[in-house]
């Protein structure tokens, strides 16, 4: 059995640190991609009293949130109109990505005789989603004047927040400042938000009315310097498994597909029942590390869909079947932390955690 153990205390402490850091700004907690792999229902249930909004990528994720919490939920992604009636009935906040969305939403709202809560996404430079910057003001004005829309928010997204010195950060902030000025001229109550986790840590004056700290809430810090208070934020989860078999190699034998790992006579290998079929990175095969009884052991051979092997050497520490194996550590400096694994596989912590799938049990402790 593979378990992602999540510390409720660490999670809540992370959010409290963030809330203190952002001052009076509201907090919108992104729980998209199954709460970055941590389990959307468990995370929402244990944080709903600490945050103002939740945010997700699509309608189906939003319904999972509204099933367990009453907080407002913002959907970042495009509007899937096959789900729009349920979204409106549950007061889920939609993101207007184009001027044309307004008329479509108005028509449906009229038919349902119920207003739609909306946030307008403005493309200030990431060039992925959102209303074109040059069309921003007329779109905001149109939505604000609509009888069937409640324009609750206007937002954008930083493209280079992980690099605090990137000039695009200033360019996007300046553009958003002009949007905020126009928006507040219509109503001071419209929530303006731009910053993700690394945005408000790396840039000044960027919190506006609300921030959206996703990866930071789960305990992952940027690589640039942050102050002492933020350094108290810790990863919330550890991925654990068990040793299910010990194998002793004979002279000339190997292990795994293609037998790329060749051991020595008498070498012992531990079999762990987790693989890339669980969303664990296949690239770690033959070069990753696991922790068994506070000793680091190297992976041996290719990772399979459902299992991997580690070399115990001569097994001087007497690893046994049933011993706990730590695959992902909550200590960033460890060789098997999400940070270290991401570096080793040329990716980011988001990727390592969010790809862990539902074959892995989530457990709040």
Curated annotation (Swiss-Prot):
Catalytic activity: L-alanine = D-alanine
A cellular component term, taken from the record's GO annotations: cytosol
EC number, as in UniProt: 5.1.1.1
Keywords of this entry: Isomerase, Pyridoxal phosphate
Residues holding substrate: 128, 305
Pathway, per record: Amino-acid biosynthesis; D-alanine biosynthesis; D-alanine from L-alanine: step 1/1
GO biological process assignments: D-alanine biosynthetic process
CDD domains: PLPDE_III_AR
Location of the active site: 32, 257
A Pfam family it matches: Ala_racemase_C
Family, as annotated: Belongs to the alanine racemase family.
Protein name as annotated: Alanine racemase
Gene name for this UniProt entry: alr
């Amino acid at each position: 059995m593979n378990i992602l153990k999540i510390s409720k205390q660490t999670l809540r402490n992370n959010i409290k640190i963030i809330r203190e850091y952002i001052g009076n700004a509201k907090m919108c907690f992104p729980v998209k991609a199954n709460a970055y792999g941590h389990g959307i229902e468990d995370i929402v249930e244990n944080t709903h009293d600490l945050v103002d909004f939740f945010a997700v990528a699509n309608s189906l994720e939003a319904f999972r949130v509204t099933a367990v919490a009453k907080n407002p939920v913002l959907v970042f992604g495009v509007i899937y109109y096959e789900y729009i009636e349920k979204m409106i009935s549950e007061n889920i906040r939609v993101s207007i990505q184009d001027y044309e969305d307004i008329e479509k939403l108005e028509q449906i709202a009229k038919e349902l005789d119920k207003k739609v809560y909306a946030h307008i996404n403005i493309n200030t430079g990431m060039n992925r989603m959102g209303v074109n910057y040059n069309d921003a003001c007329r779109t905001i004005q149109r939505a604000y004047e609509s009888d069937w829309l409640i324009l609750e928010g206007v937002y954008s997204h930083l493209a280079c927040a992980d690099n605090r010195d990137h000039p695009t950060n200033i360019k996007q902030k300046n553009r958003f400042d002009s949007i905020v000025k126009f928006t507040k001229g219509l109503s001071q109550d419209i929530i303006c938000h731009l910053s993700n986790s690394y945005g408000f840590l790396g840039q000044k004056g960027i919190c506006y009315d609300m921030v959206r700290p996703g990866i930071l809430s789960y305990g992952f810090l940027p690589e640039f310097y942050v102050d002492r208070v933020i350094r108290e934020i810790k990863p919330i989860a550890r991925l654990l498994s068990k040793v299910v078999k010990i194998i002793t190699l004979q002279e000339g034998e190997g292990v795994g597909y293609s037998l790329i790992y060749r051991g020595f006579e008498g070498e012992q290998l531990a079999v762990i029942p987790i693989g890339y079929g669980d969303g664990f990175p296949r690239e770690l095969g033959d070069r990753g590390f696991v922790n068994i009884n506070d000793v680091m052991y190297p992976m041996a051979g290719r990772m399979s869909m459902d299992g991997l092997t580690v070399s115990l050497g001569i097994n001087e520490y007497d690893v046994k079947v049933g011993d706990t194996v730590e695959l992902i550590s909550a200590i960033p400096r460890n060789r098997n932390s999400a940070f270290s694994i991401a570096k080793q596989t040329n990716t980011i912590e988001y990727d390592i955690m969010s790809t862990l799938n539902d074959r892995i049990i989530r457990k709040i402790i």
